[in-house]
A protein has these predicted regions:
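Conserved class I S-adenosyl-L-methionine
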Residues: 1-45, 59, 63, 83, 141-157
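A short acidic, Gly/Pro-enriched loop at the edge of an enzyme's catalytic core
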Residues: 103-114
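Class I SAM-dependent methyltransferase SAM/SAH-binding core
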Residues: 49-53, 57-104
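A short SAM/SAH-binding and catalytic strip from SAM-dependent methyltransferases
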Residues: 114-127
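N-terminal accessory regions of S-adenosyl-L-methionine
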Residues: 1, 93, 155-157
Length: 157
């Protein structure tokens, strides 16, 4: 594991529980509706297989699974995955969560219809590499729309 990855892992391991409390509160307020509407606008129609990269406490994964999508959330931090599973269980939502490095995905091509992420790129040593995730998904609408939105988070790349 590279030094930066270790620092990110240590940072989020210490903060996982408190961050989980914040996201639990957020899932029950009007901000969730706004995020849900924005995701609906950006994602193709229909029930999708969605990969949530850097799922953290599972916020996006839970929002999307509640809409009937099949969601897999991945995160580098086992403590965050624990928080994500707890949130999904608490809300009786079915989603799959795995510990995995966002820059070394272990899924065959076309495993997903869409890939989402929130607040991930700032933690990555090479954020542009996540844009190479497109082969893991097959998109039916403009596959660049979400990438453009992500690039706004790291314009220097």
């Amino acid at each position: 594991m590279e030094e930066m990855e270790k620092r990110v892992l240590d940072y989020w391991t210490v903060r996982a529980h408190d961050f989980g409390v914040v996201r639990r509160n957020e899932i029950h307020n009007k901000l969730s509706k706004r995020w849900s509407d924005e995701l609906d606008r950006l994602l193709p129609e229909g029930k999708l297989r969605i990969l949530d990269v850097g799922t953290g406490t599972g916020y996006f994964a839970v929002l999307l699974a509640a809409k009937g999508h099949t969601v897999t959330g991945i995160d580098l931090t086992p403590a965050m995955i624990g928080e994500a599973k707890a949130l999904a269980d608490e809300l009786d939502i079915s989603a799959r969560f795995e510990v995995m490095d966002a820059q070394s995905l272990n899924f065959p091509d076309e495993s997903f219809d869409a890939v989402v992420t929130r607040n991930l790129t700032w933690t990555l040593p090479e954020p542009v590499r996540i844009f190479g995730m497109a082969p893991r998904s097959r998109t039916r609408r403009d596959p660049h729309k979400l990438r453009r939105k992500l690039r706004q988070q790291c314009p220097q790349q």
